[in-house]
């Protein structure tokens, strides 16, 4: 019996595997387990780094947004630093620092571009002058070259007067960039600053267009007629509401366009149209009238003759000649007859232009018009014969009336 039980247990043990499938895989392929662990570590590290960087960036951006940049020179206005500390900061930005000496023993300075810091320097200057920081104001007046003490119509001068910093306002008057005005000179006159008033009159920035006024100022100052100076300043202030500007500064006015001229580059020339040929007619006392055509010419080969018994002729005036147009020649019509009852004689006008008084206008398409291209020559059917006699190429024409029996 004992042997049977042991045999059954041996068979069960042999039927079961010695290790599990997962353990067998890890034993057979040890790289699988190592790769999984590496991936886990990498993911953990990446997440940690990303979170750290993101938090750091967000904190930095938020700090930049919350804190606005202020220039160190402008920051001097809000600080409680002493005047010496302010001067040291100004020296580091706009001052001239001594670097050393060269081979010849000359001093070498480190100069900066002061124009780049014009805005901050002007703000610090106005602040220190108005709040009575005389040492800083004096340092800026002597060391900052682009300084303009009269900006804003001498704003700093009148602010120092407002806060009763008269010594600083007197320092401004002596600066080379100061532009004196009538109000400034009145202020100096009221405070008995005659030397500064004379300095303003000799200031090159003072407008000296009215030389008579300048001479009067000098005369009143030399004679100590200060009341006259005040009256002159008041009268000049009434005449001119604008402050006196420097002679170097030009008063520029905006350009005003008064007229706008449109110019077209595409020039189109109109076609030259010659005047149409106009046919003028003489006063018509006959049936169809005598027509003047521009293209007709007098035929010199006409065989018609004037009978000697003709006693009535149309004689042009002694001083007036009938001048037809340059291309117009009179062509007598073959079918026209002279009415004996007509007592009207044709008198050419002195203006050499024939203006027909008849209400009948010449018809271009009339059958009585002579066609130069026609081969038919005019036939004289009546007893009246008209001769167009040419004295020369530019002579006048005579029209002879024939005699008739009553």
From Swiss-Prot:
Lipid-conjugated positions (N-myristoyl glycine): 2
Region of interest: Disordered: 291-406
Superkingdom field: Viruses
Keyword flag Lipoprotein: yes
Extent of Polar residues compositional bias: 311-323, 370-406
Compositionally skewed regions (Low complexity) per UniProt: 324-333, 341-351, 359-369
Keyword presence, Lipoprotein: yes
The protein, known as: Uncharacterized protein R554
Keywords annotated in UniProt: Lipoprotein, Myristate
Basic and acidic residues bias spans: 296-310
């Amino acid at each position: 019996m004992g042997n049977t039980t042991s045999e059954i247990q041996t068979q069960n043990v042999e039927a079961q595997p010695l290790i599990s499938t997962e353990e067998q895989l890890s034993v057979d392929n040890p790289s699988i387990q190592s790769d999984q662990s590496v991936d886990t570590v990498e993911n953990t590290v990446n997440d940690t780094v990303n979170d750290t960087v993101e938090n750091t960036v967000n904190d930095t951006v938020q700090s930049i947004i919350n804190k606005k940049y202020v220039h160190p020179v402008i920051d001097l206005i809000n600080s409680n630093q002493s005047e010496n500390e302010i001067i040291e900061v100004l020296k580091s930005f706009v001052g001239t620092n001594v670097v050393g000496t060269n081979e010849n023993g000359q001093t070498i300075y480190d100069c900066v571009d002061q124009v780049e810091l014009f805005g901050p320097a002007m703000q610090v200057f106005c602040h220190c002058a108005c709040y009575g920081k005389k040492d800083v104001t004096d340092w800026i007046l002597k060391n900052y070259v682009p300084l303009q003490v009269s900006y804003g119509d001498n704003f700093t001068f009148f602010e120092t007067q407002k806060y009763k910093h008269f010594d600083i306002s007197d320092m401004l008057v002596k600066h080379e960039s100061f532009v004196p005005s009538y109000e400034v000179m009145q202020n100096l006159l009221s405070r008995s600053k005659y030397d500064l008033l004379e300095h303003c009159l000799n200031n090159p920035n003072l407008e000296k267009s009215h030389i008579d006024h300048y001479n009067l100022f000098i005369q009143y100052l030399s004679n100590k007629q200060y009341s006259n100076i005040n009256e002159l300043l008041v009268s000049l202030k009434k005449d001119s509401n604008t402050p006196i500007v420097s002679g170097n500064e030009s008063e520029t006015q905006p350009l005003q366009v008064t007229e706008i001229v449109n110019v077209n580059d595409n020039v189109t020339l109109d076609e030259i149209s010659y005047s149409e040929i106009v046919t003028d007619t003489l006063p018509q006392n006959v049936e169809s009238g005598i027509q003047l055509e521009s293209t007709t010419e007098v035929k010199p080969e006409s065989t018609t003759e004037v009978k000697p018994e003709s006693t009535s002729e149309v004689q042009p005036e002694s001083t007036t000649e009938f001048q037809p147009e340059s291309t117009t020649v009179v062509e007598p019509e073959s079918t026209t007859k002279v009415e004996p009852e007509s007592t009207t004689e044709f008198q050419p006008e002195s203006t050499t232009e024939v203006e027909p008084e008849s209400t009948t206008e010449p018809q271009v398409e009339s059958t009585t018009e002579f066609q130069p291209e026609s081969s038919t020559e005019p036939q004289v059917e009546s007893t009246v014969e008209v001769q167009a006699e040419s004295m020369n190429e530019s002579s006048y024409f005579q029209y002879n009336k024939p005699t008739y029996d009553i």
